[in-house]
Amino acid sequence: MPKRTDIKKILIIGSGPIVIGQAAEFDYSGTQACKALKQEGYEVILVNSNPATIMTDPEMADKTYIEPLTADILEEIIKKERPDALLPTLGGQTGLNLAVELYENGVLERYGVELIGANYEAIKKGEDRELFKETMESIGLKVPESAVVRSVEEGLKAVEKIGFPVILRPAFTLGGTGSSVAYNVEEFKEKLKVALETSPIHEVLLDKSLIGWKEIEFEVVRDKADNVIIVCAIENFDPMGVHTGDSITVAPTQTLTDKEYQMLRDAAIAVIRAIGVDTGGSNIQFALSPESGDFYVIEMNPRVSRSSALASKATGFPIAKVAAKLAVGYTLDELKNDITKFTPASFEPSIDYVVVKIPRFDFAKFPEADRTLTTMMKSVGEVMAIGRTFKEALLKAVRSLELDRYGLAFPKLTNVDKVELERNLINPNDQRLWYIAEAFRRGYSVDEVYELTKIDRWFLYNIEEIVKFEEVLRKEELTPEILRQAKEMGYSDWEIAKIKGITEEEVRKLRKEEGIVPTFKGVDTCAGEFVAYTPYYYSSYERPYYTVDGQEILDED
């Protein structure tokens, strides 16, 4: 289908001030959308209350309003500008909530403004917990045993049936705002009061706790012709119970069997169709039992989300740009891939590398804050790293956090007693990665750490191997082969030097003398299957050749 010609002017709602759970990711998405729509010849009107963004730069939109993001202000702007359409799916939760309010107040109908990207029914089904539950059950997918309550009295009746622990999720909120886990009645009463106040419609979903299950996310895009693609599947390092924004995440998924992956992929496609998002992207989250393989649908964001920015950068597929073009009538097969200039956007990205995201916390600025990670997001940012292996990407990401830590060593933890160590493994906080490494240094087995953390054993084995290699570096002579192994694993020159008690310059000199230098690999959305005109690159110490019958064959990638 060609682009729509019946709409000329499009209003985009920005995400407003930077808050926990809604930060630069939405500026990144909104900027992409403004550029894409202007490229197609549409007049773009942008409303955002935050002038410190790229999207509010003068050249991004035809007209930019720096105004408070309220329904009354938006009505005045709509009255003045008379846009043909409103695109609310790029402004995070703020954009969605305002679109719903404008629709329900009759403002959109009064001024003849059409919702594009996601219609009112799709937004309600995705965001209203009760409607979402009914929709999932209608297509045969399970959601955790739950109840929607609007008062403390209703909550007390419902929790008798659901039992403890119970997760509280306020409707129409972002970043897990107001959500929590309650383990007894007294705690439940206090947390439910907070959750009810947090929800703009005073509605809270009480969920059966699935703490300890794996959390898997799918970034899905659908068009008007019902073409659906999975842009990326993202696995959470931390099990259920930690907000996905505070969890270390990995793409592609590392621990799923093919059967589990295909099962969740089919479910994700069924969810986006049932909710009715037909011109854009959605983020769909699942809980998967590590024992039985059973799964539940946790939630769905019928909009470009925080994870969409991560998936875009991880794969090279510009989700926000594509979503904006789908909203004005294009189909996936009509849009060309920017990197290959040949394949259509309906061609699912292939990932032949590993991407790791680690959240960045800043508890030093909030000394009174509880560092325990729960269902309410606390991180203030995140870093992303790309490597050929999980170990390499993880260590790259750790160095990018700017915490003056170059690996999994954290000397302060050597004096922590066993009780405190295990308490911090059971109750995850922002230091959990280093506590896990410390446990392995003290001789804990993978199974013992798994019982305390419920983090999948595959991830734990990888961390254990990184820690064990510290001992190899410490005790063995730094031969070219050991140095190469360390670099392939992701160790930095600085960290190797510190372990060996030599200078970073000495390590670098030895490395270069032995020809141990980085090779650069491309992110091209297709794993090298097609010519890439505008790929981006990541460095790796993977050997740039393969051995065939004892002969070294150069890798031409």
Swiss-Prot record:
Mn(2+) 1 binds at Q285, E299. This is Carbamoyl phosphate synthase large chain, N-terminal section. Pathway: Amino-acid biosynthesis; L-arginine biosynthesis; carbamoyl phosphate from bicarbonate: step 1/1; Pyrimidine metabolism; UMP biosynthesis via de novo pathway; (S)-dihydroorotate from bicarbonate: step 1/3. The lineage of its organism: Bacteria, Pseudomonadati, Aquificota, Aquificia, Aquificales. It is an enzyme of class 6 (ligase). Its EC number is 6.3.4.16, 6.3.5.5. Corresponds to the N-terminal section. The large subunit is composed of 2 ATP-grasp domains that are involved in binding the 2 ATP molecules needed for carbamoyl phosphate synthesis. The N-terminal ATP-grasp domain (referred to as the carboxyphosphate synthetic component) catalyzes the ATP-dependent phosphorylation of hydrogencarbonate to carboxyphosphate and the subsequent nucleophilic attack by ammonia to form a carbamate intermediate. InterPro entries: ATP-grasp (IPR011761), CarbamoylP_synth_lsu_oligo (IPR005480), CarbamoylP_synth_lsu_oligo_sf (IPR036897), CbamoylP_synth_lsu-like_ATP-bd (IPR005479), CbamoylP_synth_lsu_CPSase_dom (IPR005483), PreATP-grasp_dom_sf (IPR016185). Composed of two chains; the small (or glutamine) chain promotes the hydrolysis of glutamine to ammonia, which is used by the large (or ammonia) chain to synthesize carbamoyl phosphate. Tetramer of heterodimers (alpha,beta)4. It comes from the Bacteria.
